[in-house]
């Protein structure tokens, strides 16, 4: 990515993917140095970050998408998430992105019935314990919601994807104050 001219990369460490599986006692039943307590379970992502940082130098952006709320049985506690967030920061992560829930979680996280910015308190709690910027995601689909998260210091940045699929002119309309013209993402999670 660096050789191709990118400013940074994001490491997917949430939603139940491989790195998240090492982090969570939900599936990590290992009894070696890669399993057990959180210090061992976080070894895999921390080593990944350290290796990337060593290759790309200090100025290259490394964003880590961390599962801040697993929503599965035996998922990480908030205390464990904070320990991991601090360790990732120390290992060289530039930004922390928000992952909420595993794909197989029975609790909805992005559908219409979930209130906008429903997980802001979880994000803000992690933000209180690190010095690197924390990105809010999940059910942030209108400019007012994003601005509120930033104004209330619950996040440093806001990430969106589905809202831009619903309206490719979202940013232009928001910047012109035409939020009433935005084709709002309704969180149907279909074809996106």
PLM feature spans:
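Flavin-dependent oxidoreductase catalytic cores
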Residues: 2-192
């Amino acid at each position: 990515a660096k050789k191709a001219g990118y400013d940074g990369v994001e490491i997917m460490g949430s939603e139940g993917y491989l790195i998240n599986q090492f982090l969570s006692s939900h599936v990590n039943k290992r009894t070696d140095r890669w399993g057990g307590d959180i210090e061992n379970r976080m070894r895999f992502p921390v080593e990944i970050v350290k290796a990337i940082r060593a290759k790309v130098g200090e100025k290259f952006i490394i964003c880590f998408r961390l599962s801040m709320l697993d929503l599965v049985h035996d998922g990480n506690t908030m205390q464990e998430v904070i320990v991991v967030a601090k360790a990732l920061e120390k290992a060289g992560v530039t930004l922390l992105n928000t992952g909420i829930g595993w794909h197989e979680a029975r609790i909805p996280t992005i559908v219409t019935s979930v209130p906008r910015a429903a997980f802001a308190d979880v994000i803000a709690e992690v933000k209180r314990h690190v010095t690197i910027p924390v990105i809010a995601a999940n059910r942030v689909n209108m400019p007012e919601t994003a601005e509120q998260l930033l104004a209330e210091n619950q996040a440093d940045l806001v990430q969106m994807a589905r809202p831009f699929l619903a309206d490719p002119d979202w940013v232009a309309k928001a910047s012109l104050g035409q939020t009433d013209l935005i084709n709002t993402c309704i969180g149907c999670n279909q074809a996106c």
